[in-house]
Amino acid sequence: MARLHSGKRGSSGSTKPLRTEVPEWVSMSAEEVQAKIVEMAKDGNQSAIIGNILRDMYGIPNVKLVTGKSVSSIMKDAGFYSEVPEDLFNLMKKAINLRNHLENNPRDIHSKVGLNLIESKIRRLVKYYKGTKVLPATWRYSPQTARLLVE
């Protein structure tokens, strides 16, 4: 499949191995994993970072196999998940950083094009999240509200 904003083809990637039970070398129990996730969420980490830390430092290949729930659902149950989805939040952060760059460098036309592409992707995601009722129907993206949300 092709890339979204370029004429290039996508690169192939590896797939996760099909596994239905917890590997025997995983030493932590489901309760310990949930407690560790809540502890890392209190420190302000996002779910993707928490998953990477659990994989690299604690040897947990798949949180859903161990606990029966995903990292984001554990964070929602504990009350640490934000009302704006993470991917949308990260794109808004990226757009704000690019706007700050363009204030200092107004003639950087390549960054203007990049900002346009990022904001198009934000609008597509907002449309999707409104359709799936993750965001309210009255929610709108604007650079000013995004700046307030991120900071």
Curated annotation (Swiss-Prot):
BP GO annotations: translation
Annotated segments matching region Disordered: 1-20
CDD domains: Ribosomal_S15p_S13e
GO cellular component terms attached to this protein's record: cytosolic small ribosomal subunit
Alphabetically ordered keywords of this record: Ribonucleoprotein, Ribosomal protein
Domain of life: Archaea
InterPro entries per the UniProt record, alphabetical: Ribosomal_uS15, Ribosomal_uS15_arc_euk, Ribosomal_uS15_N, uS15_NS1_RNA-bd_sf
GO molecular function: small ribosomal subunit rRNA binding; structural constituent of ribosome
Family: Belongs to the universal ribosomal protein uS15 family.
Subunit composition and interactions: Part of the 30S ribosomal subunit.
Protein's name in the database: Small ribosomal subunit protein uS15
